[in-house]
Amino acid sequence: LGARLSTGSDLDVSTVYFSALRDKLDPSLELFADVVLHPAFPEADFQRLKQQQLVAIQREQVSPVQMALRVFPRLLYGENHAYGLPLTGSGTPESVQQITRDDLVRFHQTWFKPNHATLVVVGDITMDELLPKLERLLAEWNPGDVPQKNIQDVPQKDRSVVYLIDRPGSEQSIIFAGHVAPPEANPRELAIKAMNTVLGGAFTSRINMNLREDKHWSYGARSMLMSARGPRPFIVYAPVQTDKTAPAMLEIKKELDGIVNGQKPVTPEELDKVQRNLTLRLPGRWETANAILDDLSYVVQFGWPLD
């Protein structure tokens, strides 16, 4: 068929994706529908992937960056929040050891419902052509109730807390700082992203210029906002030379306080640079079918208006 078919998951959604040539659409759609409705979950493949995941967790537990990504969400959200799992996406050794093929089947039966799904299609096809094909292939897909995930707000901490993972012999320290930010779908999202770009979201951002270019303590430091429907992680990441760990933490706090507390607000020049950068990106955002698909999927996932 020359088609591409893949599946994936993130903090909020699971996806089934396929891409096919127009003259191969019908057989490709049949394969797509079969995966959505009747996933096989072969036992041999399941056991192989399970062992691969356990090995991946072992590797993560000796990598400083991966170690931090594993524990950081639990510190932000607590044990019972849906976002409190390791950001590596690999889970815990205990949960992976205990999972069975039946758990996969139950997950699919519980969550994969047509009333809980959205189909985004981009290509040389009309709705009049596509809809009858989908109605025929997905006719047996029955709606039903789905559980509610715990993505509630978490209380903001009233003071800063430092957690240390002691790893003797490390060549450098890995600093993760952050807190819980508003969900992606909020009326001030553009302003929040602009703020993050100035703070640590670009090479010329304040944190990177401070720790890399001015102090020469790091090869690169940055801040990031992860995408999520619920309260999402805001993270500052900085690998620094070991003897500058404490001073680097103070510099990061200084840069955060400068924006948050208004001690060093975003300048007109910084804002203009961010605005021009975002504007110049726009023409190329819809150049390919996949680019359009990504943007539309983003709109659907976070409930943005189509305009």
Predicted regions and their residues:
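PEST-like low-complexity, intrinsically disordered acidic/proline/serine-rich tracts
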Residues: Q58-Q66, P147
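Peptidyl-prolyl cis-trans isomerase
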Residues: H38-F41, F46, I99-R101, L278
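An aromatic/glycine/proline-enriched structural segment found at the starts
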Residues: H81-Y83, K113, T118-P183
